[in-house]
């Protein structure tokens, strides 16, 4: 299980997370997983040498993005318009979520990985935080705290 708390300080513009150029979000927590040739698709395995040239041999294979933003519903899973099938975005809070309040999130990353990619991950490679407002021209201010892994 992965849990954390986050909050946004201002209302974000609704955006379509599935479309390049319209995919802004207030904040996202990314969980990356090591590349696994045994569970990777044919195209992932074919692209891997190029990924390693650009990003290095320790570049992750797949990502789950837990997102605050978009106009979908909490729990919706969307394929990344930039990374395609190797990055599944899961809406935790949409653009109508409360502003200025800490929101607790808890998710089963193993179940999410299996739902997104059809396999069970062996370990996590990285946790990353990001925000994106270049398409809508907005300004995001978000905080994230108490990121923690725990047994189910």
Predicted regions and their residues:
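Solvent-exposed strand-to-loop "edge" motifs in beta-rich extracellular domains
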Residues: 5-11, 34-36, 110
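Short loop/turn motifs that connect adjacent beta-strands in outer-membrane beta-barrel proteins
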Residues: 14-17, 117-119
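Short coil-to-beta strand junction motifs in C2/discoidin
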Residues: 20-27, 141-142
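A short beta-strand element within beta-rich, extracytoplasmic domains
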Residues: 1-9, 125-131
């Amino acid at each position: 299980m992965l849990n954390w708390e986050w909050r946004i300080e201002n209302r974000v513009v609704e955006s379509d997370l599935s479309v390049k150029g319209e995919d802004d979000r207030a904040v996202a927590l990314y969980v990356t997983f090591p590349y696994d040739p045994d569970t990777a698709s044919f195209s992932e395995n074919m692209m891997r040498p190029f990924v390693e040239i650009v990003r290095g041999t320790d570049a992750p294979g797949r990502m789950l993005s837990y997102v605050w933003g978009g106009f979908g519903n909490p729990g919706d899973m969307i394929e990344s318009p930039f990374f395609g099938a190797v990055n599944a975005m899961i809406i935790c809070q949409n653009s109508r979520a409360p502003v200025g309040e800490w929101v607790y999130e808890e998710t089963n990353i193993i179940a999410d990985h299996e739902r997104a990619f059809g396999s069970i991950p062996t370990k996590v490679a990285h946790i990353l935080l990001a925000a994106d407002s270049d398409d809508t021209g907005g300004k995001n201010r978000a905080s994230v705290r108490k990121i923690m892994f725990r047994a189910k």
